[in-house]
Amino acid sequence: MIETDKLAAERIIAATPASSHEEAFERALRPRQLDEYVGQEKVRDQLEIFIEAAKRRSEALDHVLLFGPPGLGKTTLAHIIAREMGVNLRQTSGPVLERAGDLAALLTNLEANDVLFIDEIHRLSPVVEEILYPALEDYQIDIMIGEGPAARSVKLDLQPFTLVGATTRAGMLTNPLRDRFGIVARLEFYDAEQLSRIVRRSAALLNAQIDPAGALEIAKRSRGTPRIANRLLRRVRDYAEVKADGNITAAVADAALAMLDVDPVGFDLMDRKLLEAILHKFDGGPVGVDNLAAAIGEERDTIEDVLEPYLIQQGFLQRTPRGRVATLLTYRHFGLSAPDAANPVRNLWDTPDAEC
């Protein structure tokens, strides 16, 4: 899994941050207020109402759970919530909170109505999660003083606070934890027009010249994800400054992204390698994932966790009981004629393949 995570971070079209340097770059481009936040209109409108209501009552905002694919702005929203509420934000992540004392130290240092942001909240340990329940409901925590027979439990009162939890895997949250969030919001992938607005805004902050067509060209290849759009913008800006006059046009963006092996739908070399293997080595499928992994020289986990999700979400790949199958979109993308088998229909005699 470590190798899979490393590989995901190395891809230019990966939705996870590649380095601490990139995280610092993201912070510089991050919108600071809700009215600067592009996209996610439904979530933004809801938060605007809930935040204003909490401010009028001088209360802490209800606890917020943000979930959705990586790179869509969950961390950005957590910072915006704190800024709109006019309070401090403390940030941590699930894997960092190893012991109950780690969480207790954070909670006891919060001031009234502060925001505690826990990224990857689905990775909290059960021990830490147990401490969190009374803190969320009653603004109290139980801590143990002493050891052995002399140990005793002491209740500590906390200041009212808002927990903002972020996760890419909402299904891994326990029911008791999920039920304690009063505001639950799912972030969706962005369309090309929304991403184009984000690219133009980021270009202005970077003092980069870009025209609307150039911004749209980058947006269309960003896989619906602002983090990828901003990363591609940086690379296209470099290309424009060295190979062109510094102005990012559609032609300049196309040439730069072609150099980076990012095609018109946002596929990179690894995406195309997987799809071409299914088309040419396995006649469009079905093919079991272990055979596919051997054919392209990648690990099974890499295929399932890194490569497949976007291809399936975009309709280029199907998972069937018998294996992976290329769709009509895949044949069209590679300029091939699709056989009838490219639009499979399951019948009663289909049986699951053990390696699927």
Swiss-Prot record:
The residues that the entry says bind Mg(2+) are 75
Q: Which Pfam families match?
A: AAA_lid_4 (PF17864), RuvB_C (PF05491), RuvB_N (PF05496)
For the ligand (ATP), the binding residues are 29-30, 71, 74-76, 137-139, 180, 190, 227
What biological processes does GO assign it?
DNA recombination; DNA repair
Q: Where is the stretch described as Small ATPAse domain (RuvB-S)?
A: 191-261
Q: Any idea which GO molecular function terms this record carries? A: ATP binding; ATP hydrolysis activity; four-way junction DNA binding; four-way junction helicase activity
Which residues are involved in binding DNA? 300, 319, 324
- The residues forming a coiled coil are none
List its EC numbers: 3.6.4.-
Q: What's the chief localization of this chain? A: cytoplasm
| Class of enzymatic activity (EC top level) | hydrolase
Q: Mind listing the UniProt keywords for this protein, alphabetically?
A: ATP-binding, Cytoplasm, DNA damage, DNA recombination, DNA repair, DNA-binding, Hydrolase, Nucleotide-binding
What compartments host this protein? Cytoplasm
Q: Which stretches does the entry tag as region Large ATPase domain (RuvB-L)?
A: 4-190
Tell me the segments the record calls region Head domain (RuvB-H): 264-356
Give the similarity note.
Answer: Belongs to the RuvB family.
The record's domain comment reads:
Has 3 domains, the large (RuvB-L) and small ATPase (RuvB-S) domains and the C-terminal head (RuvB-H) domain. The head domain binds DNA, while the ATPase domains jointly bind ATP, ADP or are empty depending on the state of the subunit in the translocation cycle. During a single DNA translocation step the structure of each domain remains the same, but their relative positions change.
What does the UniProt record say this protein does? The RuvA-RuvB-RuvC complex processes Holliday junction (HJ) DNA during genetic recombination and DNA repair, while the RuvA-RuvB complex plays an important role in the rescue of blocked DNA replication forks via replication fork reversal (RFR). RuvA specifically binds to HJ cruciform DNA, conferring on it an open structure. The RuvB hexamer acts as an ATP-dependent pump, pulling dsDNA into and through the RuvAB complex. RuvB forms 2 homohexamers on either side of HJ DNA bound by 1 or 2 RuvA tetramers; 4 subunits per hexamer contact DNA at a time.
Q: How does it assemble?
A: Homohexamer. Forms an RuvA(8)-RuvB(12)-Holliday junction (HJ) complex. HJ DNA is sandwiched between 2 RuvA tetramers; dsDNA enters through RuvA and exits via RuvB. An RuvB hexamer assembles on each DNA strand where it exits the tetramer. Each RuvB hexamer is contacted by two RuvA subunits (via domain III) on 2 adjacent RuvB subunits; this complex drives branch migration. In the full resolvosome a probable DNA-RuvA(4)-RuvB(12)-RuvC(2) complex forms which resolves the HJ.
What is the protein name stated in its UniProt record? Holliday junction branch migration complex subunit RuvB
